């Protein structure tokens, strides 16, 4: 809830060219965070009794995928111009090869994929300290 409120507060802070956080960014950010966080917790809870890595990895992959897809779609897709018609995000609709290599898609799709890859990388790296914590805090020494 705090993240959602902060997103909307940001729409009221004015910079040189208008609000520092546009309404579309605030809506996309708040919606993506809320949905992804709820799904992340649900998935983690359902998988927590399995292998040590399954719950954190699966919940993060699913939550991050939802967060990225919802945020970038609401914030930049031409389909959601009605959310804030005065905000020009047409720069994000330029059709380019995905990540500079693949088939062509709007720029915002590449930005979303890059964002998701960063989240995925961080999730994989974070498994190392998570494993250490689980093994040290676990009452049994036979962690799977």
List the model feature ranges, each with a label.
Residues 6, 61-70, 115-124:
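Membrane-embedded alpha-helical segments of transport systems
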Residues 49-65:
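Internal alpha-helical transmembrane segments of multi-pass membrane proteins
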Residues 14-19, 48-50, 99-105:
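Helix-boundary and loop/linker segments of multi-pass membrane transporters
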Residues 1-30, 34:
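Alpha-helical membrane segments and adjacent membrane-interface helices in multi-pass membrane proteins
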Residues 10, 64-82:
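Hydrophobic alpha-helical transmembrane segments in multi-pass integral membrane proteins
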Residues 36, 40-41, 71, 127-130:
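Alpha-helical transmembrane segments of polytopic integral membrane proteins
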Residues 77, 83-144:
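Alpha-helical transmembrane segments and their cytosolic interface
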Residues 21, 25, 29, 52-56, ...:
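Residue-level signature of transmembrane alpha-helical entry/exit and packing/kink sites
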């Amino acid at each position: 809830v705090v993240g959602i409120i902060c997103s909307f507060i940001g729409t009221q802070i004015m910079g040189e060219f208008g609000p520092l956080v546009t309404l579309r960014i605030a809506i996309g950010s708040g919606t993506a965070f809320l949905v992804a966080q709820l799904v992340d917790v649900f998935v983690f809870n359902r998988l927590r009794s399995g292998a040590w890595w399954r719950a954190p990895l699966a919940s993060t992959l699913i939550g991050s995928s939802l967060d990225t897809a919802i945020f970038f779609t609401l914030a930049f897709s031409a389909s959601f111009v009605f959310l804030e018609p005065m905000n020009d995000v047409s720069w994000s609709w330029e059709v380019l090869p995905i990540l500079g290599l693949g088939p062509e898609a709007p720029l915002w799709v590449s930005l979303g994929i890059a964002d998701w890859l960063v989240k995925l990388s961080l999730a994989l790296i974070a498994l190392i300290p998570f494993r250490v914590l689980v093994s040290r805090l676990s009452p049994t020494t036979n962690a799977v």
